[in-house]
Amino acid sequence: AEREIVRNIKEKLCYVALDFEQEMQTAASSSSLEKSYELPDGQVITIGNERFRCPEALFQPSFLGMESAGIHETCYNSIMKCDVDIRKFLYANTVLSGGSTMFPGIADRMQKEITAFAPPTMKVKIIAPPERKYSVWIGGSILASLSTFQQMWISKQEYDESGPSIVHRKCF
């Protein structure tokens, strides 16, 4: 039951700040960002900077004690591992998918962060389809049903022998 309450708070009240430090300053100096939430027992709690501090862990995993890159940096690193000839298409067609991308503000923040990493003249476009909560599952099921999909499979041995270039060779 507690997990459901937290999930409900996350889905109804949380958002990704475009500028985390600025948002922290705003939250510290005024109550404009605070929202009330009624618990099942009728108790009313106030949610303040937690509204954007929790999703910030997607961009700064160190908030959770993790030593890993945020989603923006992981996305950039993935693009940089691809063949140089297709990078501009990846920058211009980055699609958000999955439940954790449903936070309001996440597309604008990804746009800002990836633009900061990308070459200055690069066009960066983040696409956030409204149905993205289930798009991972839907896309996977469509891909698995294609008759041509099996020829795109890559074994660990193939990847170990060829590295990331095997993906480009087999899938494009």
Swiss-Prot record:
Q: Where would you find this protein in the cell?
A: Cytoplasm; Cytoplasm, Cytoskeleton
Q: What does this protein do?
A: Actins are highly conserved proteins that are involved in various types of cell motility and are ubiquitously expressed in all eukaryotic cells.
Which Pfam families is this protein grouped with?
Answer: Actin
> What are the annotated GO cellular component locations?
cytoplasm; cytoskeleton
Q: Which InterPro entries match?
A: Actin, Actin_CS, ATPase_NBD
Q: Which SMART domains match?
A: ACTIN
Upper classification of the source organism reads: Eukaryota, Metazoa, Echinodermata, Eleutherozoa, Echinozoa
Output one GO MF annotation. Answer: ATP binding
Catalytic activity, as annotated: ATP + H2O = ADP + phosphate + H(+)
What is the protein's name according to its record? Actin, cytoskeletal 3
